[in-house]
Amino acid sequence: MNLPEHFLVTGGAGFIGSYLVERLLADGKAVTVIDDLSTGSLDNLQAVIANPNLRVIESKVSECRALSEIVAESESIYHLAAAVGVELVVNSPIRTIQTNLRETEVVLEAASRYGVPILLTSTSEVYGKSQKPAFSEEDDLLIGPPHLGRWSYACSKLMDEFLAMAFVRERKLPVTIARLFNTVGPRQTGKYGMVLPRFVAAAGAGQPLKVYGDGSQTRCFCYVSDTVEALLRLKRTSAAVGEVVNVGSEEQISVLDLAHRVVSLMNSSSSIELVPYDVALAPGFEDMRNRRPSIEKLWRLTGFRPSHHLDEIIALVAGQPIKKGAPQGAP
């Protein structure tokens, strides 16, 4: 009997990682998850935890004694383990930097030892203070000063990218880097500052939706199944090796309009409050004013574009049907 292909997913008990694990198992693969459960949860894997092709190891990647053995038997690696969420980054910059750098270095070394291809997830945060209407993978990057801890996440993930590309050049390791833009969906928690689950939870409870700053900052939200599909396609595409590729939706909305949209679609009585960044997060906090990807490279390499629109995403996160008569795209 042929054994199923084996994949390692670091951070596989996290929000995105758990959906990726489910998809790999559904495709008949065997999966090992390494996750320290610092921001992930076994609850995210509840639907597949009894699957005989799934093995879960509760550990940091850097402290996993079986890492070499696991990597050696893996067809590919998806490295998603990282510090996540703006509030965690602001409050724990040391943890953020150490987690992102150490875990990535260790998994790249292990992958290089056995020549196992790896897909590394990065972040749109690396675009920093760019004022371009759409971010391209070839753009110069402008990140804020080191005394503002909020940039520690962007800087550490950018160093992950540099390190990964060094492994491509010096050790010929097949690495693909996916820069993710605001992936959302059920299971995502607002605990660490993620905006859409915060808004949906507040609207569902009839509590005020707290918008940081003046709400004019814009974002593009990509549904988690679209993100997972993009990751799988990139991993299967040989032309994506050694490349950085944006993964996200191009449907843009201001955070204030998002709050109004959530209230409207959920038929909520909640009010909307503007909260200064200094109060909500940290003194001197600098936000990215706009965050919209160019996904032409993703389309060129994989033939894939996200298919879920924002109103549908909000309804899926809220766990309810879209309100009748609410036009797509209306605030």
Each PLM stretch: what is its role?
Residues 1-181, 225, 326, 330-331:
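N-terminal Rossmann-like NAD(P)+-binding domain of SDR-like oxidoreductases, especially those catalyzing
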Residues 44-46, 130-133, 188-191, 224, ...:
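Short aromatic-enriched loop/helix-cap "lid" or pocket-rim segments at secondary-structure transitions
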Residues 50, 63, 131, 188-192, ...:
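Residue-level signature of the cytosolic catalytic core of signaling kinases
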Residues 86-90, 185-186, 280-284:
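A short acidic, helix-capping loop that chelates divalent metal ions and anchors anionic groups
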Residues 107, 167, 199-202, 230-234:
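A short, amphipathic alpha-helix embedded in the catalytic core of nucleotide-handling enzymes
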Residues 159, 163, 167, 199, ...:
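Hydrophobic alpha-helix immediately C-terminal to the catalytic Tyr-X-X-X-Lys motif of short-chain
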